[in-house]
A protein has these predicted regions:
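C-terminal engagement/docking regions of AAA+ P-loop ATPases
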Residues: 34-115
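Conserved AAA+ ATPase small/helical "lid" subdomain
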Residues: 1-50
Length: 115
């Protein structure tokens, strides 16, 4: 079991992330810090965890490079618990809903992302 985990970790580390995809990921993170309904956005450590999650998700699904679609898909799952809402108790939306909303407004890159 430990060997399998080490192999999985190595596979995650080998996944390529184009600089435009990293910028896109960081734009989403930054948007959580500027959103009117979010009191506390994603931290730098949260951004690193988001990047690692994208790389591991890609590796586990047989990919060699992270796509903007993967970054967008994972955002609510990875970032939803990393933000604090302005009006935590009266908001009808969940934190993950706000993150999902942000991904619709942040422009994704469209280049070729393979290494």
């Amino acid at each position: 079991m430990a060997e399998q985990l080490q192999e999985m970790k190595k596979a995650c580390e080998k996944v390529y992330v184009d600089s435009t995809v990293v910028d896109y990921l960081l734009d989403i993170v930054e948007a959580t810090r500027k959103h009117n309904n979010i009191a506390l956005g994603v931290s730098p450590r949260g951004a690193l965890a988001y990047l690692k999650a994208a790389k591991c998700y890609t590796a586990l699904n047989g990919g060699d490079f992270v796509t903007p679609e993967t970054v967008k898909f994972l955002a609510p799952f990875v970032l939803g618990h990393r933000i604090i809402l302005e009006d935590l108790y009266s908001s009808k939306k969940k934190a993950a809903d706000y993150v999902q909303e942000i991904t619709h407004f942040v422009t994704a890159p469209t280049e070729d992302f393979a290494k």
